[in-house]
Amino acid sequence: MALVKPKSELTPEELARQEEEEFNTGPLSVLTQSVKNNTQVLINCRNNKKLLGRVKAFDRHCNMVLENVKEMWTELPRTGKGKKKVKPVNKDRFISKMFLRGDSVILVLRNPLATAAGK
């Protein structure tokens, strides 16, 4: 059984090796694979918007540089007086390059269409 040293006792080389291992096998492997294979991911954000795009870079805080992003959300249109039952309207916009701060990320999914096509 290998002894696990606390992070404070690791050399910079050991820290880098451990971080790379975590990025390749842990939850962040979804982002690692997206960067390596240039595949799309679907990101749910705290502002209740969804981002579908390609990850160019990321860090351990889930800060991301994204390209070719489609931002999607729903809005309730304003109603005049006396009108009822407003249907939500789906909206979207294209963003060619963006930086996404990690604290706004809730969930990251591999593109289900690309995953299904690969099977």
Curated annotation (Swiss-Prot):
Gene Ontology molecular function: RNA binding
Pfam families found in the cross-reference section: LSM
SMART domains, per the entry: Sm
GO cellular component: catalytic step 2 spliceosome; cytosol; pICln-Sm protein complex; precatalytic spliceosome; small nuclear ribonucleoprotein complex; spliceosomal complex; U1 snRNP; U11/U12 snRNP
Biased composition (Basic and acidic residues): 1-18
Keywords (A to Z) from UniProt: Cytoplasm, mRNA processing, mRNA splicing, Nucleus, Ribonucleoprotein, Spliceosome
InterPro entries, sorted: LSM_dom_sf, Sm, Sm_D2, Sm_dom_euk/arc
Subcellular location: Nucleus; Cytoplasm, Cytosol
Region (Disordered): 1-23
One GO biological process term: mitotic cell cycle
Major place of residence: nucleus
Entry annotated with the keyword Transport: no
Ranges where the Sm domain occurs: 28-114
Recorded family membership: Belongs to the snRNP core protein family.
Assembly with partners or alone: Interacts with the SMN complex.
PANTHER family to which the protein is assigned, alphabetical: SMALL NUCLEAR RIBONUCLEOPROTEIN SM D2
Task performed by this protein: Plays a role in pre-mRNA splicing as a core component of the spliceosomal U1, U2, U4 and U5 small nuclear ribonucleoproteins (snRNPs), the building blocks of the spliceosome.
Protein name: Probable small nuclear ribonucleoprotein Sm D2
